[in-house]
Amino acid sequence: CFADSEWAAIRACGPEERPMEMCFRKHWSLKEAFTKARGDGIAFEFLRCEFELGGPGSGEGVEPGQSVETASLKVDGKPMPEWHFFIQSMGDDHWVSTSRGPPTDAVDALGGFKKTFGQAVVPPLDAKAHAARPEPAFVTKTVADLVPDALRAKYERLAKAHI
């Protein structure tokens, strides 16, 4: 599932196991973010996409939500500069990756994925401006955080009754 260059990057974080595992998790998270953003998920062969970590905002020992690391992508050996990736620590050795790419790259095998797009075709200048925007810090939320204020008391009563 990893290209030779990705395995080399993972091994280069050694010899300690934990840094290698963190690099492994970052790469895996990037592959998931890319294939889910495309719409084909695990149907896309992970070996076809190759990531290189680094870029503005990257750094070691980043506290959760404090900094964003970037990555670049090649698919079948071809650089994909129109795709932008952001990796953030969620703490407890977990990583979240988000991706931004052209809607035209989306795969819609069942005909429902592209219907979720707010804008199916994005003019090139708008796409560049959107891709250049900084990535906001990832914020972890509980289910209760997502319940509207007007329903929160009812939700909390129901949640407490089922514990």
Predicted regions span which residues?
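Core catalytic alpha/beta fold that binds nucleotide/phospho-ligands
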Residues: 1-163
